UniProtKB/Swiss-Prot annotation:
Cytoplasmic side: 180-218
Reported tissue expression: The overall expression of isoform 1 and isoform 2 is very similar. Isoform 1 is abundantly expressed in skeletal muscle, heart and brain. Isoform 2 is highly expressed in brain and skeletal muscle and present at a very low level in heart, placenta, lung, liver, kidney and pancreas. In brain, isoform 2 is most abundant in the cerebellum, followed by the cerebral cortex and occipital lobe, while isoform 1 levels are higher in the cortex compared to the cerebellum.
Keyword Glycoprotein annotated: yes
Signal peptide start-end: 1-18
Job description of the protein: Regulatory subunit of multiple voltage-gated sodium (Nav) channels directly mediating the depolarization of excitable membranes. Navs, also called VGSCs (voltage-gated sodium channels) or VDSCs (voltage-dependent sodium channels), operate by switching between closed and open conformations depending on the voltage difference across the membrane. In the open conformation they allow Na(+) ions to selectively pass through the pore, along their electrochemical gradient.
Entry-linked SUPFAM superfamilies: Immunoglobulin (SSF48726)
Top-rank taxon: Eukaryota
Protein name (record): Sodium channel regulatory subunit beta-1
Presence of the UniProt keyword Oxidoreductase in the record: no
Example GO biological process: positive regulation of voltage-gated sodium channel activity
Effect annotated for changing E87Q: Found in a patient with non-specific cardiac conduction defects; likely pathogenic
Transmembrane segments: 158-179
Clinical condition linked: Generalized epilepsy with febrile seizures plus 1: A rare autosomal dominant, familial condition with incomplete penetrance and large intrafamilial variability. Patients display febrile seizures persisting sometimes beyond the age of 6 years and/or a variety of afebrile seizure types. This disease combines febrile seizures, generalized seizures often precipitated by fever at age 6 years or more, and partial seizures, with a variable degree of severity. Brugada syndrome 5: A tachyarrhythmia characterized by right bundle branch block and ST segment elevation on an electrocardiogram (ECG). It can cause the ventricles to beat so fast that the blood is prevented from circulating efficiently in the body. When this situation occurs, the individual will faint and may die in a few minutes if the heart is not reset.
Length: 218
């Protein structure tokens, strides 16, 4: 849960035109038959510098030795290589509407065991300065394991336990507050009743005295 929250926050920051950029590691465990996002984020050192970026993704299947290119994304065009393992399964999920890519993530739909292995996200960036241009390149490496069902990590378990503990504590606090308020209201009601009774007795006693005085005068 904690890691998922970090991914969400990182994606929100990267996708915001005016926001910052946070590099977040990708999840590494994909579930068979499900859609899986491989995260690749490469931030510029200086956000105010204009740049153009393109990426190439390569893949080495588990048990093999060579990397093969599976896609290239440049100028908002996704070019997929002919590879039956990824045919109709790869979807671009990175930056859109800009040549200055910082989020270069992809989706793999309907994951199979053939997608287990090592992925490389190659980031090629051309930086434009006032009097010159500068090329940079970065390689993000991600190892993916495909499993039958999701395994919960320790952070997720701890987060859920803390959530239930917080709910229990808040419930106890709420019950205690209700009991306190009830007792306070009951005490105030009892005090008011006693005061009313005292006033009633005083008035009754005064009335009797007045009646006695009238009878004596007669």
């Amino acid at each position: 849960m904690g890691r998922l929250l970090a991914l969400v926050v990182g994606a929100a920051l990267v996708s915001s035109a005016c926001g910052g950029c946070v590099e977040v590691d990708s999840e590494t465990e994909a579930v068979y038959g499900m859609t899986f996002k491989i995260l690749c984020i490469s931030c510029k050192r200086r956000s105010e510098t204009n740049a153009e970026t393109f990426t190439e993704w390569t893949f080495r299947q588990k048990g093999t030795e060579e990397f093969v290119k599976i896609l290239r994304y440049e100028n908002e065009v996704l070019q997929l290589e002919e590879d039956e393992r990824f045919e109709g399964r790869v979807v671009w999920n990175g930056s859109r509407g800009t040549k200055d890519l910082q989020d270069l993530s992809i989706f793999i739909t309907n994951v199979t065991y053939n997608h287990s292995g090592d992925y490389e996200c190659h980031v090629y960036r051309l930086l434009f300065f006032e009097n010159y241009e500068h090329n940079t390149s970065v390689v993000k490496k991600i190892h993916i394991e495909v499993v039958d069902k999701a395994n919960r990590d320790m952070a997720s378990i701890v987060s859920e336990i803390m959530m239930y503990v917080l709910i229990v504590v808040l419930t106890i606090w709420l019950v205690a507050e209700m009991i306190y308020c009830y007792k306070k209201i009951a005490a105030a009601t009892e005090t008011a009743a006693q005061e009313n009774a005292s006033e009633y007795l005083a008035i009754t006693s005064e009335s009797k005295e007045n009646c006695t005085g009238v009878q004596v005068a007669e």
